[in-house]
Amino acid sequence: MGAETAVDILFVEDNPFDVDLTLRTLRACHMGDRVQVARDGKEALDFLFGAGKYEGRRLEEGPRLVLLDLKLPKMTGLQVLQWVRADSRTKDLPVIVLTSFEDDREVVEIFRLGVSGYLVKPLNKDEFCDLAHKLGVEGARAN
């Protein structure tokens, strides 16, 4: 795999409606060109670490940012975040958690685990663009 298969953003979301809305926000922030969507937590980890159907994929090909829903099939977003932070290759990878509700205990837990940011769905374009820009993700600017 080479530059043509590089990915800027791994978007982990199982709800097709939320996928569509968030991809629109990414495009509005000039970040929608190289996005990989994973539909569950296991697929996200397989993509990151080159396992399963992504066997042979190298982490050097991206992503530079993970957008992570908390309520996922097969493995929760919290479990994915734990795996990402526990691995030396991904411990510093920016992760923004996206969720459709605010649960104070969950918010405390994701920050304890080292999340880079937290946004409530549906995404506010300006808030997302600002946070992505602060995390150093290129192209993160609003129209």
Residues of each region from the PLM?
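Alpha4 helix (beta4-alpha4-beta5 surface) of REC/receiver domains from two-component response regulators
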Residues: E4, D20-R24, Q79, E102-G117, ...
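Conserved acidic segment of CheY-like receiver
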Residues: A6-F17, T22-R27, V66
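Acidic, metal-coordinating helix/loop segments flanking the phosphotransfer/catalytic sites
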Residues: L23, V37-L65
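Residue-level signal for the "D+5" position in two-component response regulator receiver
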Residues: V37, L72-M75
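Acidic catalytic/metal-coordinating carboxylates
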Residues: D40, E61, T76-Q82
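Short amphipathic alpha-helix used as the core "switch/output" element in two-component signaling
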Residues: K53-G56, L78-K91
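Active-site residues of response regulator receiver
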Residues: L68-L70, T99
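A Lys-centered signature of the CheY-like receiver
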Residues: K121
